[in-house]
Amino acid sequence: MSSSDIDRKIAVIFATDLVGYSKHMENDENATLRGLRECNKIIEAIIKKQKGRIFNTGGDSVFAEFPSAVAAVDTAVEFQKQIKARNDKDTTDVKLEYRIGVNMGDVVKEGDNLLGDGVNIAARLEALAQPGGITISKNVYDLVANKTKYEFNDLGIQKVKQNQFHAYDLLLDPSQKRKLKTQSSNTKMIAMIGGAIAAVFIGLFFSGVLDTETKLDSSNICH
């Protein structure tokens, strides 16, 4: 199949996943399943309201596309707020939390499903997000920062698995502000370590040369 046969488009992708699903199921299966159904109804209603479309689900995860970056980010914020309100009212010990990632990128259409880097990076952003938090890519940030009143925290260049991207946290609360190691800082650290090792070897080399020359000089004097 040639690239011209692949149906591509640019899309804003929303990815969310339940934190600690397996552990919740082990602790209280009935309460977890009930809570999951409630949360699914909440997210479905918000996505529909924002004119989004769910294109894939995985039990405790949801992937949706949106007509605009603002709509996707508004959905993420509203969902997290409603989940928090639900947890505050829930009398069980099962407090469900979600991570959310939002990205805009190139995707491949496969029937009603979407695939490709645009979706993969949204999933990586979701994995990078804090429980109850939202993490977005720089291209989404550039579109929404001046159109919304949300606060953001620049996380710099991040690498998750094989994907590298510039990420931002959307701060629902000041306590969510954090600092992560960036890919550039990791590169600098490797360079510094490499430089230090090189300096040691150079020092040992010249030390050996000087020691050899000293021995030769001593030998010549003895003769």
Task: Enumerate the language-model features and the residues they cover.
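Catalytic beta-strand-to-alpha-helix segment of the class III nucleotidyl cyclase homology domain
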Residues: 4, 41, 63-165, 169
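Catalytic NTP-binding/metal-coordinating core of nucleotidyl cyclase/transferase enzymes
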Residues: 2-75, 81-82
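Intrinsically disordered, glycine/charged-rich C-terminal tails and inter-domain linkers
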Residues: 132, 139-213
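A generic structural signal for short
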Residues: 31-32, 110-111, 186
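Feature marks short, surface-exposed loop/turn motifs that line or immediately flank catalytic pockets
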Residues: 20-22, 106-108, 174
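Short, Lys/Arg-enriched, disordered terminal segments
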Residues: 1-6, 181-187, 218
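Acidic, proline/glycine-rich low-complexity intrinsically disordered segments
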Residues: 209-223
